[in-house]
Every structure is written in structure tokens, then in C-alpha cells.
């Protein structure tokens, strides 16, 4: 059918489909999914009890408002004010929040609301940005390369040079960054927000991993990180934040996310949602209100950091023992972005490593998927990340350990 174009699968979807063809299914005891982009969702020591059932009010079988249930919008605004804006004169309100059905829906709404602008994005970054930035032709995506040799550091002075030199009106980024875990926090994040305000460059910040923070920057009180802490005027500063239940609450299947920003932006995001997706699930939005209680959020975050820091320590130790190279230890997220360049030649490539790992019933994500190239406008040369892979410590500690054991067996077999 010539009316339709072929669409690529994003990283996790691609590797999962390849694994399914070899017998993988979610929860299969013989497989280790080190490619997964979601955290383990079961009980954690010290965490609030998991929600096991929902009671649905008959009125909630109707559509939810495109912008989300007002009560949930109020609860999200109150949470951000409690966590990040106590004592500040400018406070978020329900009008500063829009609810949507998943992170991609929230990001798609935000990009659809942009005018004809140059939008900067970093390399590497979240795989889904590639198709997202291609479909809206009003937006001109401008790649900003981060240097492996400099451990992917990028200062506010570097940002100023890019904004002024390339005429950027907006910047899309994940913080902490998926895949390599680089975190901008504290004084550095405050300066980024200040620069956005000074140069009127809108910062679209994906904060889905803001509870998974391991190394805080100077001046960052933590324990979770958000640009909301450094906004002066919630209705004037060009800072738009996207987050949700997916990672920081460990409820990815709920598909409940939110956008927080100036009222004018939220109105545009709502309008975009009216033709893009129509809004999220009303019963689940109702159920999510209780999860916005600050004590619940803080307890969940502490439990996450306790459990996932142990898995992070195991991951970093084992990948080094196996001969992989960490260009940068992850400051946040639950991923390690590793290089295979010192491994045996036949598996020194991320895609070759992925296919070999499937033979051992382990899933990984090749690094090329994070070389975001909207519309494939850049020449199809060998990716700078072709020797990299993203390994997830999102699964249980036992699954992560077994997966690393199997990768060790595989590497030793290729080295023999």
C-alpha cells in the first residue's frame, strides 16, 4: 500500500521484537531483560504498599477532560510546590499542569505546540525523540554532539554558544539523561534555567528519572531533582517539565503523565491533545490523585534509591570486570551506557553484541538507537555509538545478576 511509509521501531521495541521471535515473553524465567526501559514494579522494602485494585465510579466511564482531571492537576501542582517551591512567591496551580496518557503523548503534545523554531537536542539521548522530531516539520531539529572524550559534559557556557550560534528557540533533553545517566543539578541546573530565561530559549525537560539520582551536583538539596526548583516565575520562565507515574512511581502500565509549565504553554498543550490523543484514562487519573501525597512520594523515592543503588553498584562492578568501558558512571537513571571497544572483535559492536547476547537469552539495546537522527538528515555514516550498548538495572537484582553472569560466559567464549 503505497499510501503508507515504513516506520522504524524504537530501540526497546526493536530489541523486544527480536527477542520475542526467539521465544522471549515478559516474565519468562529463562530470559534476562537488560534492555528494559521500565523499573521493577513489585514491592520494595520501605516503599508504600502497591495498589492492587481500583474501584471505578460509574461517572468515570466517561471521557476525561483533554487537559486531565482538575483534581489531579491540582494535586500535581501542590506536589511540585511542596517539593521544590516552598517559600517562593510564584507557585504552580492546576492551570500550570496538563495530564496525558503516557510520556510519548506528553512529549508529542509539547512539540506539536511549538512554532517554527530551531530546536536543539543532544546526542546521545532518548530513542523516541528521533521519530518525534521528524513528524512535525515546523520544527527544525538541531543536533548537539556530546563528546565521549569529555565524559559527555556540557556546560552552561557551551549551551549559550549553541543557543546564540545556532539560533535555538527551544531545547529538548532528558535529565537525568537516557541512556548515559548524565545529570544536570544544583547550581548548574539553576544556571541553565537562568540562561533559558535570559535568552528566551524554552527548555523542554523530560524528568522521568528524577527519583533515580546517585550523584548530586553542588548546591542541589535533592533527593530528587527538578528544574521546577530554579524557576522564578512559573508563568513567565520558559521551562516545560514532563514527568509521570512510569518510572518515579513505578507504575508504567498506568500511562499517566503530566506536563508542568507556564499557563500559556499548558493551554497550547491541551489544544494539541485535543487532536492528537483526546486525553488519558479517567479512572486511572482518579486513582493517581492519592499517589501525589508528598509523604508517599518521598517514601517511594527513598525505597527506589536504596534498592536501585545496590543494583547500580553491581552493574558498574561487573561490566568493568567483563572488559566493558564506562565513559561516564551514571549520575542518574537505571542504565549503564557501556562501550564494547575492548571486547573480542566479533562482539565489539553494539548490534553484534546484542545478537550474540540473544543466543544466551539476554536482551540489550545497541547504542546506535540513541544516535538520534530525525528524518535521517545526517549522512548514513557509521554511528559514533556503534560500539556502545545500554544495559538496564531496571529488573530485579536477581535478574540483573543472572544476566551479567550470562554476558560473562558469552564474552569468555568469544575470547577463547
PLM regions: where:
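Conserved core segment of the aminotransferase class I/II
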Residues: 79, 134-135, 229-306, 313-319, ...
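Short beta-strand
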Residues: 27, 31-33, 242, 325-331
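Conserved glycine-rich beta-strand-loop-beta hairpin in the small C-terminal domain of fold type I
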Residues: 289, 305-316, 326-341
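Conserved core of the PLP fold type I
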Residues: 60-199, 210-234, 240, 328
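N-terminal small-domain helix-loop-helix segment of the aminotransferase-like
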Residues: 5-101, 158, 292-296, 413-416
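PLP-dependent enzyme catalytic core of the Aspartate aminotransferase-like
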Residues: 78, 82, 86, 161, ...
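Helix C-cap/helix->beta junction micro-motif
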Residues: 26, 166, 198-199, 322, ...
Amino acid at each position: 500500500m503505497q499510501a503508507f511509509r515504513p516506520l522504524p521501531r524504537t530501540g526497546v521495541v526493536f530489541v523486544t521484537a527480536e527477542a520475542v521471535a526467539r521465544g522471549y515473553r515478559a516474565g519468562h524465567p529463562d530470559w534476562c531483560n537488560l534492555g528494559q526501559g521500565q523499573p521493577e514494579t513489585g514491592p520494595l522494602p520501605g516503599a508504600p504498599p502497591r495498589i492492587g485494585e481500583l474501584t471505578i465510579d460509574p461517572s468515570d466511564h466517561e471521557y476525561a477532560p483533554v487537559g486531565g482531571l482538575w483534581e489531579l492537576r491540582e494535586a500535581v501542582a501542590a506536589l511540585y510546590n511542596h517539593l521544590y517551591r516552598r517559600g517562593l512567591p510564584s507557585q504552580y496551580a492546576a492551570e500550570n499542569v496538563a495530564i496525558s496518557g503516557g510520556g510519548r503523548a506528553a512529549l508529542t503534545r509539547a512539540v506539536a505546540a511549538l512554532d517554527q523554531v530551531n530546536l536543539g537536542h543532544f546526542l546521545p539521548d532518548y530513542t523516541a525523540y528521533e521519530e518525534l522530531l521528524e513528524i512535525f516539520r515546523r520544527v527544525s531539529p538541531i543536533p548537539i554532539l556530546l563528546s565521549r572524550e569529555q565524559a559527555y559534559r556540557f556546560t552552561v557556557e557551551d549551551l549559550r554558544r549553541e543557543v546564540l550560534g545556532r539560533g535555538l528557540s527551544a531545547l529538548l533533553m532528558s535529565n537525568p539523561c537516557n541512556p548515559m545517566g548524565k545529570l544536570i543539578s544544583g547550581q548548574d541546573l539553576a544556571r541553565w534555567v537562568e540562561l533559558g530565561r535570559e535568552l528566551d530559549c524554552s527548555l523542554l525537560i523530560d524528568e522521568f528519572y528524577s527519583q533515580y539520582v546517585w550523584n548530586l551536583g553542588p548546591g542541589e538539596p535533592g533527593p530528587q531533582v527538578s528544574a521546577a526548583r530554579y524557576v522564578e516565575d512559573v508563568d513567565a520562565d520558559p521551562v516545560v517539565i514532563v514527568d509521570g507515574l512510569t518510572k518515579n512511581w513505578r507504575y508504567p502500565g498506568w500511562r499517566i503523565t503530566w506536563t508542568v509549565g507556564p499557563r500559556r504553554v499548558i493551554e497550547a498543550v491541551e489544544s494539541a491533545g485535543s487532536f492528537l490523543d483526546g486525553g488519558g484514562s479517567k479512572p486511572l487519573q482518579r486513582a493517581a490523585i492519592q499517589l501525589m501525597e508528598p509523604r508517599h512520594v518521598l517514601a517511594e523515592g527513598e525505597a527506589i534509591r536504596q534498592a536501585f543503588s545496590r543494583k547500580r553498584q553491581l552493574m558498574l562492578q561487573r561490566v568493568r570486570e567483563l572488559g566493558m568501558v564506562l565513559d561516564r558512571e551514571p549520575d542518574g537513571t537505571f542504565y549503564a551506557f557501556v562501550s564494547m571497544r575492548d571486547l573480542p572483535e566479533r562482539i565489539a559492536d553494539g548490534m553484534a553484541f546484542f545478537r550474540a547476547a540473544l543466543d544466551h537469552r539476554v536482551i540489550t539495546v545497541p547504542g546506535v538507537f540513541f544516535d538520534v537522527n530525525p528524518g535521517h538528515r545526517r549522512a548514513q555514516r557509521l554511528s559514533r555509538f556503534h560500539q556502545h550498548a545500554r544495559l538496564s538495572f531496571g529488573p530485579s537484582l536477581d535478574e540483573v545478576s543472572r544476566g551479567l553472569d550470562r554476558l560473562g560466559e558469552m564474552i569468555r567464549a568469544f575470547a577463547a
